[in-house]
Each structure stands twice: as C-alpha cells, then as structure tokens.
Amino acid sequence: TASTKPLLVTMLILLATSAALCWQTMLGGLAGLINMRRGNTADTMPAMAAVASILQCIMFLAKPEWYNPATLCLMTGPAALLLCGNAAGKAIDAHTIRDNFTLVSAGMDHAVAYRLKDAGVLRTVTAGLAEPRPNVLVSRPTRLMKGFLAGSESRRTSDKNQQQFARILLGCGVAAFLFTLLYRKDAGTAFTALAGVLCLGAPLAGTLISAMPMRLMQRSAAQIGAVIPGWKDIRLLGRVNVLQVTAQDLFPKGCITLRGIKPVRKEDIELAIIYSASMLADVNTPLKDIFLGMTGDNRKLLCKVENLETLDGMGYVGWINGERVMIGSRRLMDTYDIQLPSMEYERRHTVNQRRVIYLAVSGKLFSMFQVAYQSDPDTAAVLDSLRRAGLSLIVDCDDFNCDEALLQTAYNLPVGTVKVLSGKEHKALEPAVAWLPESEGNMLHLGSFASFVGGLEAAAGAAEGEHRSSMVLSASVLISCILAMIMALAGGLAGLPLPALALYQVAWAVLAMIFPLIQRY
C-alpha cells in the first residue's frame, strides 16, 4: 500500500548503503559461494542475508499487496546488524596488523622463527629424538621479516568451517522459501522466510571469533617483543614439535657458578684466571660470565688472544704471548695429548651437576676449574609446560660441558626429548640459523628464550581461543537452521519479532566471545 512504501524505500536505502560500505564483504562472500576456488571466507553468510533482505524489500515494492506489516517482518535491520558485526571483526584485524607492523618495522635487529624445511638437515639434527615426525622450529637473527603483510592477510582457521555452513544455511533458506511458496501459496511470506532463515542462521560473530583472539594474542606477544603475523603462521607454529634452543637459553646468568680452582702450581692461580677469562671474553658462551666475574669485569686485565679457534663440543684453542692456550673438556685435552688426572679423579668432582674445565698452556695442564649447573626456576616452569605440550628440544650448544645427561638431570627431562648437537650437526644447522638482512618466518621475536617461547604460547592461546569459539559458532548455525526450519513449517518465521531476533544473535555472539576473553595468551 502507499502508506508502507516510504518505509520500504527507507529500509532498502539504508541496507543498500550498508552493503555498499561493506562492498568487499558482499563481493568476497558471494564470490566464495559461487566460486570455491576463490577460497574460504567468513563473509558469505552475512552477504547472503543482506542480499535476501534487499530482495525482500524489492519484491514488496514491486508487489505492495504482498506486504502486510501486521504479519510480516522486514529483515533489513538484522541483515545490517550482521554486516556491522562482520565489519567490527575486520576493524579489529586492521588495528592488530597496524600495531604488528609498527613492531616489525622498528628497524631493530630481531630474530625470526621458521620451520626447518631442508630434509637432510632435519634428519641430521633430530636423529636420536623420540619424535617420529619432527617439525623443527629454528631462529635466525635478522633485521627485516619478509612476507609480513601476506601473512597478516592469510585465511582465518574458522573460515573453511563457516564457508561449509554457508551452503547448509542457503539450502535451508531455499527449502523454507519453496515450502512456503508451494504449500502456503504466499509469495510475500516465502521471501520473508528466505530472508528470515538467512538472518537467523548467519552468525553475528563470524569474523570476531578470529579477530578477538588475534588481538589479545598481539597484545600479549608485544609485551615480550614477539609478533605472529597471521593465522597461517599460527597454524604452522601449532604443528611444531621440536624447538631449537641454546645453552644460554637453558642456563641464564647466575645458573652456572664456580665451585673451585685447582691450579697445578698455587702461585699460578691469578694467571690461570686471567688466561681463562681472556680465552672466553669474546666467545658467545654462558661460561664467560664466571671468568670475567673473577676479574671484576675489568677487561684491562685480559691478555690479547690470537687465532682463537672454536672446537664444537670440546672447547677453545688460541695463542697468548706466543704460548698455545687451551680451555675445554677432557676430550679437547685428549685430542692434543695433554696429560690429565685419572677419570676416577674427575668423576669424584663431577657429581650433582658439576663439571670440570681444564686449562692447558704450552702443552701442559695449567689448572682445573670446577663449575656447578643449577636449574633456573622460570626456565624449569617453561620447559615443564613445553614437555606437557609434547615439545622436544635440540640444543645448539655454546657450552662444551653441556650434554643430554646434564639437561635431563637439571630439568627432569625425559630421555629422548632433548638432544645436544655435535660439532658436525652444529655445522649442518649453521646456515639455517645464520644472520640475514631479511628473512621469511612465522614469528618475529627479540632472540631471547622468553620472547621465543612466549610468542609460541601466545599463538597457542589464540588457536585454542578461536577453536572453542568456532565450536560455539558451529552450534549456533546448526541450532538456528533447525529452529528456522521448524518455524518455517509452523508458519511463525515470517512474523518473528525483530528485537527477539537481535537479542538471539547478540546472545550467541557473547557466548562465542567468552572463550577468547578467558583464554591465557
């Protein structure tokens, strides 16, 4: 009738404007429904609801006699609400990407974590672990992370699920339309039933269930200097079961202490300390803090070391004042035929996580140092969490004393879950962890153990939060489809009160959002 035409025109213009503002959602959603190659998307269900509601208004304008305001509800309001929910999720995503980009483009040296893909290196460094199908996450220092924007725009994990439900929802809508049209012989009610099914079944939180966990993950990870670009990276990090770490990660400063010095001649004790500190001063090893500490961190006391050579897993060889100086393990001394005390003597001094460091000068034993390794409480808690999550460790060792037995004892790690790389294995892995000016990766971090593991935990929290929300969303779509079909058969769908429909959608959205909000990141 003439009295309803202004209302229909107004509602049509408002919904069409909303759809135009969300044109990417409309285009992507409908294209995803028609062309499966375009990829999965969470835009299809709100786009279908908007199209059906626009079609409802157009049909009522074309056939005014079909529209009875007393018995039929216009679905333009719920459809616009669904588009707003979709846009809200995308706005949160945009803020997350912006904040991540600020961290990534800071121009600082970082490290990128990525999955080791070289099959040969992978077999070499994981041989001996109990993990049958190792997926190793390694880190390399870099200045720029490549592919950040592409990773940020990757498909959400829940998109595939929502795309499948979109087809189910459309089938229910078409079935309700045909039943109402053929059984009740009422075209106006049939178009209302179609729009009603799609507006009732489409989730308000379709993009929010991914955007909210990603946002909360970003905030948590940023506090420890970590950045995970997008859902593709979260999924890949979730498949990792082996982490590459260093001895410095496992034994931070203060965990290794000096328990005794036994020079061959007592008068050489000061020289033994200076020689040892000089040899380790410029080496990346947790042992150097002990010896530099004995000199009061006064580098003026140190001697110049020439031709310093690192022998992986054994120690260091260099020249001081024309004399060859060696500091390291028994194996290093045996390699150069240095006369040492008996193994029985060494065993008496290597109980309770203690180790002996030998210093030789000019081919003769000069001094012995006894050091003790203690577990770090924070590191122990992290390793226990990793163990319960099924993660193993490969230790790219920068401490010649560190071995599997020491780590298993210090941190109560099961046999087969930790491996210390040999010199050959270290060389095989070295190109994969060497510095590059720019590198692809799945996570950017500060290079510290806390930032590395904290980023992994944040990503795992986001994945778990989205998974639980996705289960709620799936239940909401299925229950809504069943309710919509029952109401369509009973003839009550066309007259569904709009406030009730809006509250129904909001209730499901709130329920879905609870899980990301209570999830630990």
Where do the PLM segments sit?
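Conserved ATP-binding TGD loop and adjacent catalytic N/P-domain core of P-type ATPases
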Residues: 134-135, 320-322, 361-505
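Asp-based phosphoryl-transfer active-site loop
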Residues: 233-260
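Signature of the cytosolic headpiece of P-type E1-E2 ATPases
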Residues: 7-11, 62, 296-406
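Transmembrane helix-loop junctions at the membrane interface of multipass transporters and ion channels
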Residues: 54-71, 180-188
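C-terminal ends of transmembrane helices
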Residues: 23-33
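Cytoplasmic-side transmembrane-helix entry/capping segments in multi-pass membrane proteins
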Residues: 35-47
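Hydrophobic alpha-helical transmembrane segments
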Residues: 14-25, 76-105, 112, 130-242, ...
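ATP-binding catalytic core of ATPases
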Residues: 149, 158-159, 262-312, 334-336, ...
